[in-house]
Amino acid sequence: TPIEVGTTNKTHLKDYENAINDNTGALLKVHTSNYKILGFTKEVSNEEISYLARENELVSINDLGSGQFVDFSKYGLPYEPTVKEVLDSGIDIVTFSGDKLLGGPQAGIIVGKKEYIEKMKKNQLTRTLRVDKMTLAALEATLKLYLDEKEALEHIPTLHMISLSKERLFEKADVLKTRLSDLDFKIIIAEDKAEVGGGSYPASYLESVVVKLEHPRLSATELERRLLEVEIPIITRIKDNELILDM
């Protein structure tokens, strides 16, 4: 039975330590992932949790939620530890998603010390929860791209979009404006902010470039609806009665 420790905004190492008893099997830390607590906060580091677990002969687990192999802070996002960095901190087991920031198919991934992975493989739930062959094939193809970070940034859509420079975004916006120039639109290119989305990096924004569209007869709401109904739906947003295409 899981035992919650600490409070919503502050958790100390002593909260974990005081909750350990004869029935304790593991210490778990869960990433907030799709929300962020600001202000008067405190959390326990991975190093502290792994040390306390070793001292009490327990397993340390970190559920990273999204999980990532690339440090996105160099592209303007707040620093978040990569899967490798969490493992290097001494955590025994790390869990994360195959999609979201990793950019692969929807799946749950468990990595960590071999002795614990082997025990999980023998659990009767493994067969029930295992992914299908198509998911495995897609995940393998995605992970192979990470052998070369440049390849991953170029060919994995999520990573490619996060890492695009502002200059490249302006180039894309100019191309789109040119293609739409013969239509009955007022077209404006502007700088803006964009969210990563997918339940990752809450309250964080990327520098972005957008194309704003206004039509003399159709409202922004009507334009948005029509673009969603085409064969390949186009996702837009509305701001100040303008239709926004984010690059």
Regions found by a protein language model. Name each.
Residues K166, F170-D246:
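Conserved C-terminal alpha-helix-loop-beta "cap" of PLP-dependent enzymes
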Residues E115, Q124, V131-L180, D192-K193, ...:
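Structural motif of enzymes handling amino- and sulfur-group chemistry
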Residues T1-Y146, S181:
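Conserved PLP-enzyme active-site core in the AAT-like
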Residues D92, I110, K119-K121, E149-A152, ...:
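Homeobox/homeodomain signature
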Residues G98-D99, I117, K122, T126-T128, ...:
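Generic secondary-structure boundary/loop-capping signal
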Residues P2-G6, T11-D15, L27, V111, ...:
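Unusually extended, aromatic-enriched hydrophobic runs near protein termini
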